[in-house]
Amino acid sequence: MSDDSSSPLTTLKILIIGESGVGKSSLMLRFVDDVFDPEQAATIGVDFRVTSMTIDGNRVKLAIWDTAGQERFRTLTPSYYRGAQGVICVYDVTSRSSFEKLKHWMTEVDTYCTNDNVIKMMVANKIDMPNRTVTREEGLKFAKRHRTLFIEASAKTKEGVQCTFEELIEKIIQTPDLWDNDRPTFRLGQPTDTSSGNLCGC
């Protein structure tokens, strides 16, 4: 995904949260390994992947935490939110209940994230499915209300997956307070419009 011969600008902690079954693991595995398993088992506790990517000429290392959506794992909550610079909150466009519970997940982010300016991305997953129950307009409205980035995606078809991480990481890099200021020199292209409800142009 990037040239490992160059040292990374920084290491970023990225969380993927949301209800069980919305496709969190599938999104992570599609991004990291470019694979999709329709029989992907539910995450037990926390899964973890490390990868790297290059944004505007800056290589960054990503520590991606894929969290379980089940209530019985809520005791893990404070530890895995600690120090996160980015949070991807996923819902399933075919599951109305997963969308309605987004408010709960946003409350968790506000309660447990130690970085006040953590970058949040709302991902409407499974847009390849025909039985959609949550409209794009509803997702955009929620994202605007909670001041998060927004994108629609499909881990199955790959649509929007790369853009999800690229847009999130670019916004983090544009927020220097979120990462190590011991290395202040970095190169950025023209800043993109990352206002609430922005859709990646990939």
Swiss-Prot record:
PANTHER family attached to this UniProt entry: RAS-RELATED PROTEIN RAB
Enzyme class label: hydrolase
Superkingdom of this protein's organism: Eukaryota
Keyword Transport tagged: yes
Entry's Gene Ontology cellular component terms: endomembrane system; Golgi apparatus
Modified residues (Cysteine methyl ester): 202
Short motif (Effector region): ranges: 40-48
Catalyzed chemical reaction(s): GTP + H2O = GDP + phosphate + H(+)
Family: Belongs to the small GTPase superfamily. Rab family.
E.C. numbers: 3.6.5.2
Function comment: The small GTPases Rab are key regulators of intracellular membrane trafficking, from the formation of transport vesicles to their fusion with membranes. Rabs cycle between an inactive GDP-bound form and an active GTP-bound form that is able to recruit to membranes different sets of downstream effectors directly responsible for vesicle formation, movement, tethering and fusion. Plays a role in apical endocytosis/recycling. May be implicated in transport between the plasma membrane and early endosomes.
Organism of derivation: Caenorhabditis briggsae
CDD domains reported for this sequence: Rab18
Residue positions binding GTP: 20, 23-26, 37-38, 43, 69, 126, 128, 155
Gene Ontology BP terms: intracellular protein transport; lipid droplet organization
Coiled-coil segments: none
Official protein name in the record: Ras-related protein Rab-18
Lipidation (S-geranylgeranyl cysteine): 200, 202
